[in-house]
Amino acid sequence: MAVNLRGVTTVLLAGTGSDDDYVYRAFSGPLHDAGAIVVTPEPQPSRLIAGYLAALDDAARSGAPIAVGGVSIGAAVSTAWALRHPSRAVAVLAALPAWTGEPGNAPAALTARHSARQLREEGLAATVAAMQAGSPPWLAAELTRSWLAQWPDLPDAMAEAAAYVAPTVEELATLTVPMGLAAAVDDPVHPADVAVEWAAAARHAALHTVTLDEMGADPSRLGAACVAALLEL
């Protein structure tokens, strides 16, 4: 199922608390190499999911099919959009999917709920300091920048993302377009097992992996893994 992204508008959605700056750096190089037109909407923390869906709808308004994807919650929302609009999507790029179906006690959902509660109870400065103390330096720097920019609506975005119902295994089995997946083998918040489950469920999917150290040294390693998985189909 060959995929050609040349000239295709490709919309990438950021993860919860992350931003369009990071997702652009992660995906733009590999996608430009493939000839794609890269669009990375700025998250709207006061209406995270609705804002993402509106951005996808806007990109598809010209009538030309688009490629969609993102990181974590961005991967889930874009995949759900592709499932609802099979004639408007040509491919999905799903990096670090966090859970399948109901969020339940998935690590990313628990982390987002905890951070939202801490932000509301202790404030931004204390929560950022705690995040920095428990994160690799590269991730702490990324999230410090994006969290500051998304305050004071950040806890609302985190709570909304933590309640989001991702595509189920049964729904993924109905995905008609090819899907390239990327997982970090040592990421405790986005377990690689979730990406493996998505890849097994979808009809036309491939999975490539990276490590957190590789992502920290060069964000484009994540996007490159995702694009390479898609292009091998």
Where are these regions (language model features)?
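Short beta-strand/loop motif that positions the catalytic acidic residue
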Residues: 175, 181-183
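Conserved alpha/beta-hydrolase "acid-adjacent" motif
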Residues: 188-194
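Catalytic active-site module of serine/aspartate enzymes centered on a nucleophile-bearing elbow/loop
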Residues: 204-233
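Conserved HGGG/HGGXW glycine-rich cap/lid loop of the alpha/beta-hydrolase fold
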Residues: 2-47
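Gly/Ala-rich beta-loop-alpha elbow adjacent to hydrolase catalytic centers
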Residues: 70-78
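Conserved acidic catalytic loop of the alpha/beta-hydrolase fold
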Residues: 32, 48-66
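Helix-rich cap/lid subdomain of alpha/beta-hydrolase
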Residues: 96-145
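Hydrophobic, aromatic-rich cap/lid helix
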Residues: 141-170
